[in-house]
Amino acid sequence: MPFLTAEVRKGAPMGNLKNANDYIRSILKKSEGILRELEEYARENNVPIVAPETARLLTVLGRLAKPGRILEIGTAIGYSAILLAQTLPPGGKIDTIERDEDMLSKAHENIRKAGIEDIVNIIAGDAGEVLPCLDKQYDMIFIDAAKGQYPEFLPECLRMLKPGGLLVSDNVLYKGMIAKEGPVARKKRTIVNRMREYLELLCNNPALDTSILPVGDGVAISYRRTET
């Protein structure tokens, strides 16, 4: 079963979690080099990238899992791909999918700047159309894309995720709205309902062991069992 604090489960205000994340950010080691540059660019240009505490979690997961091949759904400007590339063992590869042309251009530029063009393969296109065409097996899959499409991504991700692999999903608490009781703003209802559906699918899938962490905007970590 996923881990959720009692406060979150009851729909209490997320203020305590926000304060915790602020504290965590204050003590984390600051990024350097290209990652620091991209953080500043994202902040100045309002580009969404993973939160600092989520970035640290991804780094730890990558170091522990030692994935030979990673699939990322949602490249944006390439920040997470560059971050995860630093955790790969020798010979490791990353495939990353992005549909936005401006993001694709910036991602290619940043991947070149990071000197990892031979490691990171950027695939242009909508993930819903690209995923069924992929025939590789992955040790780790990271989803950070259109939140309302997570349920559609899941079957294809499970098809390609190796036994013993990790499926990491970002923004699964979506600004605290997923765990909040009461009415949801009309323009957010679809995303909230689809994300709740996605979490139910993760937590009730017999092939997965899933934990939901209140880190950043919420991260679900699902381990693909070696036997079911």
What are these regions (language model features)?
Residues 3-140, 147-168, 172-228:
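A short alpha-helical cap/connector motif
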